[in-house]
């Protein structure tokens, strides 16, 4: 790990020509202080959930108040615990770390792996993340441990390295043996750093050689135009008819790219570092001005939390390691930490803004995973950079098109939006929106207006997700929808959608030709229903036009509104009172209704954790046309 620090310094020097000599330089002390305060708040709260004196099978584990069990990946907390033990000198953190790793014997297997959960999921690919956390804890803070504990932890790390070497079906980027497919790419990307680090710790050239092979293979898994890392899904050998491959922003920025950056810096692989740098820049295009990550379109967006991902680690360390030559990375970390703080209630990080207001408890997985991420960047030495660098999406640049994921970002006036026809699917159907969907609409003062959910909510990774405990649930993505004999047909699952973007003076138009289908591409009994939509963006807001809305279909607009916010709804529009203004939805053509809601007048969707008012706009008259206008004043 120390190699990371040296190579990062040399790498920064090689880019020094990009910064003018007169540019002001500052220390990031305030950023680190904010991170440490939040880290301590999280960890001190986590300690209140650590079991003691209950039963030998429970003692040392952290009981999750949302899931009523101990998560098998709780061992990742060993890193922040050891960091705080070293930072504060308080033995409570060291003692908690030792107790925790003793509990981890419950999920430790004879083959050297750690299971994802006790008797819930025997998946052990996550051993790579447990190994990284334990390695960094020993590497940075092993001097705090007695010899017996230190030797035992190192023995487990060596066994974990052997396990990763013997299981290419989990970590390799090459088909071999009886493998049917490659695993999700975040495991391969992360094993490069894990095996290189363990190879150095134990003087194992074979570990380091395998890390080199996987890293070399991974260079072929970046898209041609935009350098998205792909492989978060099974269909990786042939692009879709629209040229897409399975990409997930959340896993890329919170696990894969940071760990690839660590590896590349450790071994001074300049080619890989250049690829990772370009990919990081592309992904940064999707951070909203409030510090949120826009993963409204990714293949694994069923774990999107607005600020990041439910069980992934966090982007801070990898981006921080390269921040000296990219000051925007520091700004991204600062804004995301600010959002994480806002999303923390009673010491726990919640998976979305409206969890607490909707009566949904916080799973502790988000807290300990992102505590690990905060610690990873705090372990690195302070950097110096030009004082301020705006984020790409701060600027009202109009429209940017990302060909490899068939997605457009709109930035006009105070509005930011995402329109997607990304058609690379995950292992299951009905996950991320397709079909020319507006997967996100955001305003500088109003905040998020629309934020896509899965097309239908399901526990795709049951141990890592929360079930819906409220009466009503529906997709939170704007769509044209028809329900027939209990089956939902909409444009969100349509794989046969045409999208045409044109600029008209100071307006941006998206013309969508799509169809109403279910997740299996089946049509209603009457046959295929083509639907034409137009989205028009301007500084004033957005309009949506449905030229002809067939049969019983309607336009569904799930408008994000906290349960405490006041709404005024008529058949011709809706007013939503915000702190600094009013969001207005006007029906120019059509009649507005509200779908059934829970007692608070909202529907809550666990992904990405917002409450919304489910507006339904039905056509009036023979022309079956719908037109709505969205403004904020």
Which residues does each predicted region cover?
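Bacterial Sec-dependent N-terminal signal peptides
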Residues: 1-22
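Beta-strand-rich recognition/accessory modules
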Residues: 19, 589-633
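Low-complexity, Ser/Thr/Pro/Gly-enriched N-terminal "stalk/linker" regions
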Residues: 22-76, 83-113, 158, 162-165
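Extracellular polysaccharide-recognition and catalytic grooves
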Residues: 68-72, 132, 136, 158-397
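Well-ordered mid-protein domain cores that form the structural environment of catalytic cofactors
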Residues: 120-171
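Catalytic and substrate-binding regions of extracellular carbohydrate-active enzymes
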Residues: 362, 372-552
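Surface-exposed beta-strand/loop patches in extracellular or lumenal glycoproteins
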Residues: 551-565
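Solvent-exposed beta-hairpin/edge-strand motifs
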Residues: 561-588
């Amino acid at each position: 790990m120390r190699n990371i620090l040296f190579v990062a310094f040399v790498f920064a020097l090689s880019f020094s020509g990009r910064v003018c000599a007169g540019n002001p330089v500052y220390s990031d002390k305030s950023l680190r202080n904010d991170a440490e305060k939040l880290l301590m708040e999280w960890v001190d709260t986590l300690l209140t959930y650590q079991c003691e004196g209950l039963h030998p099978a429970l003692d040392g584990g952290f009981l999750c108040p949302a899931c009523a069990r101990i998560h098998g990946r709780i061992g990742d907390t060993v890193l922040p615990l050891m960091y705080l033990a070293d930072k504060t000198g308080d033995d409570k953190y060291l003692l908690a770390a030792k107790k925790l790793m003793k509990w981890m014997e419950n999920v430790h297997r004879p083959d050297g792996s750690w299971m994802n959960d006790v008797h819930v999921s025997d998946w052990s690919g996550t051993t790579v993340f447990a190994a990284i956390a334990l390695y960094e804890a020993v590497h940075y803070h092993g001097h705090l441990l007695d010899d017996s504990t230190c030797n035992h932890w190192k023995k487990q790390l060596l066994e974990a390295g052997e396990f990763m070497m013997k299981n290419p079906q989990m970590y390799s980027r090459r088909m071999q043996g009886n493998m049917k497919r490659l695993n999700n790419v975040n495991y391969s990307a992360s094993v490069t750093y894990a095996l290189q680090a363990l190879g150095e710790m134990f003087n194992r050239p074979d570990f380091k050689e395998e890390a080199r092979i996987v890293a070399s293979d991974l260079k072929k898994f970046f898209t041609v135009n935009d350098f998205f890392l792909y492989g978060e899904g099974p269909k990786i050998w042939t692009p879709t008819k629209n040229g897409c491959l399975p990409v997930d922003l959340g896993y890329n920025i919170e696990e894969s790219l940071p760990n690839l950056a660590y590896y590349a810096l450790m071994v001074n692989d300049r080619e890989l570092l250049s690829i990772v740098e370009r990919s990081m820049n592309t992904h940064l295009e999707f951070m909203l001005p409030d510090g949120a990550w826009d993963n409204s379109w990714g293949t694994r967006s069923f774990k999107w939390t607005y600020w990041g991902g439910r069980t992934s680690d966090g982007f801070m360390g990898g981006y921080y390691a390269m921040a000296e030559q990219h000051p925007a990375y520091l700004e991204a970390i600062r804004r995301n930490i600010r959002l994480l703080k806002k999303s923390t209630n009673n010491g726990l990080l919640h998976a979305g803004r409206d969890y607490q207001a909707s009566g949904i408890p916080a799973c502790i997985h988000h807290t300990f995973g992102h505590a690990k991420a905060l610690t990873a960047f705090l372990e690195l030495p302070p950097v110096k950079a030009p004082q301020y660098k705006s984020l790409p999406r701060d600027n009202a640049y109009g429209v940017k098109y990302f060909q490899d994921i068939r997605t457009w970002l709109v930035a006009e006036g105070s509005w930011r939006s995402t329109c997607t026809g990304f058609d690379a699917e995950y292992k299951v159907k009905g996950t991320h929106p397709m079909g020319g969907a507006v997967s996100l609409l955001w305003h500088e003062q109003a905040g998020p207006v629309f934020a896509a959910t899965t097309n239908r909510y399901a526990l795709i990774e049951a141990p890592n997700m929360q079930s819906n405990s409220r009466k009503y649930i529906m997709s939170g993505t704007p769509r044209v929808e028809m329900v027939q004999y209990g089956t939902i047909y909409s444009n969100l699952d349509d794989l046969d959608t045409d999208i045409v973007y044109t600029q008209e003076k100071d307006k941006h138009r998206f013309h969508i030709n799509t169809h109403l289908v279910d997740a299996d591409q089946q049509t209603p009994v009457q046959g295929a229903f083509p639907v034409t939509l137009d989205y028009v963006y301007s500084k004033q807001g957005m309009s949506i036009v449905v030229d002809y809305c067939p049969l019983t279909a309607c336009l569904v607009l799930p408008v994000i509104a906290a349960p405490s916010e006041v709404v005024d709804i008529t058949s011709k529009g809706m007013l939503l009172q915000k702190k600094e203004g009013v969001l207005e939805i006007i029906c120019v053509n059509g009649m507005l209704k509200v779908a059934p809601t829970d007692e608070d007048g909202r529907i809550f969707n666990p992904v990405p954790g917002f409450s919304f008012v489910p507006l339904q706009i039905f056509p009036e008259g023979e022309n079956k046309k719908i037109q709505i206008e969205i403004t904020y004043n």
